[in-house]
Amino acid sequence: MLDIKQIRQQPDWFKEKLATRGVQPEEIDTVLELDAKRRELLQQTETLKAKRNEASKKIGEAKRAKQSADEAIAEMRQVGEDIKALDEQVEANDKDLFDKLAHLPNVPHEGVPVSLTEDGAEELRKVGQARQFDFEPKHHWEIGENLGILDFERAGKVSGSRFVYYVGLGAQLERALYNFMLDEHMKEGYTEVLPPYIVNAHAMYGTGQFPKFKQDVYQVNGEDMTLIPTAEVPLTNYFAGEVIPAEKLPVYVTALTPSFRSEAGSAGRDTRGLIRMHQFNKVEMVKYTKQDQSWEELDKMTANAENILQKLGLPYHVITLTTSDMSFTASETHDLELWMPAQNKYREVSSCSNCLDFQARRLHMQYRDENGKLQYVHTLNGSGLAVGRTLAAILENYQNEDGSVTIPEVLVPYFHGITKITKENAVPFNNK
């Protein structure tokens, strides 16, 4: 949520900055009109309350003088009705103002590439060399299906498209990956959390998924509850409505959860494989910081995500997303994209974002600065990493010509000595 006081003070600046995110100037004008109307209605209410107090005083004086107070009583009754009518107008106006503010995205940070499309992202660095194959590399779904460790067909019978069974060493690889990710993050000072997977609408509003992106999630019929689209939601809401002791900041938390997404608007995109699923595992990182810490912490969070890829030996690059491509709540986002040899392109595996006080303002999360003044915390979130996409990249980058897949060295301890996934060991029940 943006600060209405700041919008009131710098309307042209907000129009200019938010125009880079597709916001029309008229949307800011509407917010300002509703804000002006609100202040006018509140002033009228205060005037009437003063009038009511004066009428009450007249009634008291008349009664003490044993005179008729009928006129003052009638006046007070009328003023009361007028105040009630104004209160209803204030409530309706506040609802409109709140709704309009809730649809405005965060202001992009200085230096974020300006574009109304995803084109124009700035590459910050490229790490690792793409493997040169002496055979035609297969897509991850082909490798997984041939080995029997990814079963899209049976998942389709049970759940429909964009679902998968991980089987045998496929399930073990998924588990090894998220355990490795969590272990690495905890070494960097993150506290592991196992959060709820179903949250209420207020939690979804707090992190910015609601009201604008309701069509992208799965909601429980007849209840004000939603399956989480990312662990960012329950993790960021952990301190909602609280004043966090300043000496605790920054706070780092991490969690593995399933993520549930309807993928509305994705028809025809990535219809095969693990890239775009309705349900997928993801390890999330969330930080709460003081206001002067968040940009340094964004760099650290991005490095935490990169650490996983570097230890897995996967080539990737880091880009800064454009003003219109980053998430609704973000002021700046760094994406990590993995090299997928069969697709011959990079695919996103992590987004690390600084949301400044945008989410904290919605969730009323604060701390006291050195002067004892309440300040909103800054929140950051990042994938560390999307597990299925990382697994897909391992299958493609570590594939062998005979169809087997070499297990990255750092994951071998999770496999109790197995170093390669083959047709013979991939799915034990297939060998009976």
Curated annotation (Swiss-Prot):
Binding locations of ATP: R261, S262, E263, E348, V349, S350, S351
Cytoplasm as UniProt keyword: yes
Keywords assigned: Aminoacyl-tRNA synthetase, ATP-binding, Cytoplasm, Ligase, Nucleotide-binding, Protein biosynthesis
Compartments reported by the entry: Cytoplasm
GO molecular function: ATP binding; catalytic activity, acting on a protein; serine-tRNA ligase activity; transferase activity
Protein name: Serine--tRNA ligase
EC number, as in UniProt: 6.1.1.11
Chief location bin: cytoplasm
Pathway stated in the Swiss-Prot or TrEMBL entry: Aminoacyl-tRNA biosynthesis; selenocysteinyl-tRNA(Sec) biosynthesis; L-seryl-tRNA(Sec) from L-serine and tRNA(Sec): step 1/1
Catalytic activity: tRNA(Ser) + L-serine + ATP = L-seryl-tRNA(Ser) + AMP + diphosphate + H(+); tRNA(Sec) + L-serine + ATP = L-seryl-tRNA(Sec) + AMP + diphosphate + H(+)
GO aspect biological process, one term: selenocysteine biosynthetic process
Stated role: Catalyzes the attachment of serine to tRNA(Ser). Is also able to aminoacylate tRNA(Sec) with serine, to form the misacylated tRNA L-seryl-tRNA(Sec), which will be further converted into selenocysteinyl-tRNA(Sec).
Disulfide bonds: none
Enzyme class: ligase
InterPro entries hit by this protein: aa-tRNA-synt_IIb (IPR002314), aa-tRNA-synth_II (IPR006195), aa-tRNA-synth_II/BPL/LPL (IPR045864), Ser-tRNA-ligase_type_1 (IPR002317), Ser-tRNA-synth_1_N (IPR015866), SerRS_1_N_sf (IPR042103), SerRS_core (IPR033729), tRNA-bd_arm (IPR010978)
Record-level GO cellular component terms: cytoplasm
Subunit structure: Homodimer. The tRNA molecule binds across the dimer.
Pfam families per record: Seryl_tRNA_N (PF02403), tRNA-synt_2b (PF00587)
Domain comment (free text): Consists of two distinct domains, a catalytic core and a N-terminal extension that is involved in tRNA binding.
Binding site for L-serine: T230, A231, E232, E284, S383
Organism: Limosilactobacillus fermentum (strain NBRC 3956 / LMG 18251)
